[in-house]
Amino acid sequence: MSTKLDTILENPQYAILCGITVFTLFIVQLSLFDRGRNYPLLNPKGSFEISTNRVVREFISDSRNLLEKGKSLFKGQPYRANTDWGEVVVIPPQFLDALKSHKDLDFTIPAQDDSHCYIPGFEPFDADPNLSKVVIKYLTKALNRVTGPLSEEASIAFRTVISDSPEWHEIQPQPAFVRIISRMSSRVFMGEELCRNEEWVKLAGDYTVQSFKTGDELRMYPRWSRPFVHHFLPSCKEVRRTLNAARNCLNPLLERRNAIKAEAKAKGEPCPYDNSFEWFEKEYSTHDPAVAQLNLSLVAIHTTTDLLMETVFNIAQHPELLAPLREEIVRVLSTEGLKKTALLNLKLMDSVLKESQRLRPALLGSFRRLAMADVTLPNGDVIKKGTKIVCSTSHMWSADSHESGEEFDGYRFLRMREKEETEQGKTSHPHLVSPSSDHLGFGFGNHACPGRFFAANELKIALCHMLLKYDWKLAKDAVPRSASFGMILMPDLRTKLLIRRRSEELDIDSVES
């Protein structure tokens, strides 16, 4: 008997299946307690099905088409859907302006739950409000003085990761860009010494990739089963190992850092450091430095790498953009230097980035909120307390929101910007960092991404280096295809780039910052 039990426990998939089967027998049909029962359900479970596991898995594998179906069926009215984020009420985008600052709609609780921060190893996904405070209070205010360090680190990272070879060579863009953005972000967050610690850079990049991939795997299981399932999943164990390795990597570095700070204090000298280690110490009474740094890295690395990759793909498919983008960089940086204000004047680049994000935002569902009390919608309907709402992002590429909405147009938001500048009082939100109900790439409302200003600067600096120093094209004339996985809209990870060093028109490494 014990031998059979040992065999079961040694087989993770069998153990998981048994566990789910046992627990499912005790699950009461959740539909009896639906908080949004007055809305039609897009993908109901079968009459004899105990759980929604099948329909959720179908949603995960075909979410983009299902959300388009919901949009077509319910025509601007709220509806329910069984998703990898649980049962949600999908609200139409025309409701967003009225709800964007609603005090009873909370982002933190559903974000924490959907990111599995209750599972050991996923602590860096904790949507702590103090993180937003750190970003707004320290990082955003430091933008002007970090452009130089960001550019310096970008130069080293591109040379290390992409190489200076003038010959065409093939790269896998996702891991390459993860390393580059990790280095750039860590330069600001952790300082020059630590950002060049290859062990830390690798661990931060590995944790980002592993945790998001494992999170996707966990969403294949019912929410109630995940606190049990994670014990058996090798990927969850790997996430925990990487987090512990990150802690072990930082400990000796922090000890040396603290000794230097203590020595400076004893001499009556100011603290020699001004980066996120100090920011967190000022804002938190107690915190785990590795978790805090990985929290910042998750926010900075994943979404920034994602948008950089998509933009590089789009430029490769529209090579006519290369010359005007390079001309803009040379004109702006040669006259204004590498400053925050100069980056704001890279208007075509800003438009290309925003257009890339419009056509493939990181999520198929934005404005994720939990009703903390009954909330009245603009049409008079009442969302009951405890209901999770979300807005599909499919309208971002719809002709209802944008002319020729399904086509890439790198000049789209530049034209809007120029029109806005000539028409006083008109606001079309053409800037990359300006969220609107028509463009949810950085979220919307009170909980729009607080790090978007830093991300925009980091992206522009990375693109300045790449455009000036490299030629690139898609390998084997590939056409990148995004893929949906539940509420996540992923880039094409199979597409490779051919890239080579070129002679730049402007030596960006010599531009004054």
Swiss-Prot record:
InterPro entries referenced in this protein's UniProt entry, alphabetically: Cyt_P450, Cyt_P450_CS, Cyt_P450_E_grp-IV, Cyt_P450_sf
Keyword Transmembrane: yes
Annotated metabolic or biological route of this protein: Mycotoxin biosynthesis
Listed cofactors: heme
Any one biological process term the GO annotation gives: secondary metabolic process
Chain sites annotated for binding heme: C449
Glycosylation, residue list: N130, N295
Enzyme category, top tier: oxidoreductase
TM segment ranges: 13-32
GO molecular function per UniProt: heme binding; iron ion binding; monooxygenase activity; oxidoreductase activity, acting on paired donors, with incorporation or reduction of molecular oxygen
Domain of life, source organism: Eukaryota
Keywords annotated in UniProt: Glycoprotein, Heme, Iron, Membrane, Metal-binding, Monooxygenase, Oxidoreductase, Transmembrane, Transmembrane helix
EC identifiers of the protein: 1.-.-.-
Entry membrane topology: Single-pass membrane protein
Cross-referenced PROSITE patterns: CYTOCHROME_P450
A single cellular component GO annotation: membrane
The protein's role, per its UniProt record: Cytochrome P450 monooxygenase; part of the gene cluster that mediates the biosynthesis of equisetin, a trans-fused decalin-containing tetramic acid with antimicrobial activity. The PKS module of eqxS together with the enoylreductase eqxC catalyze the formation of the polyketide unit which is then conjugated to L-serine by the condensation domain of the eqxS NRPS module. Activity of the Dieckmann cyclase domain (RED) results in release of the Dieckmann product intermediate.
Family stated for the protein in its record: Belongs to the cytochrome P450 family.
Protein name according to UniProt: Cytochrome P450 monooxygenase eqxH
Native species: Fusarium heterosporum
This protein's encoding gene: eqxH
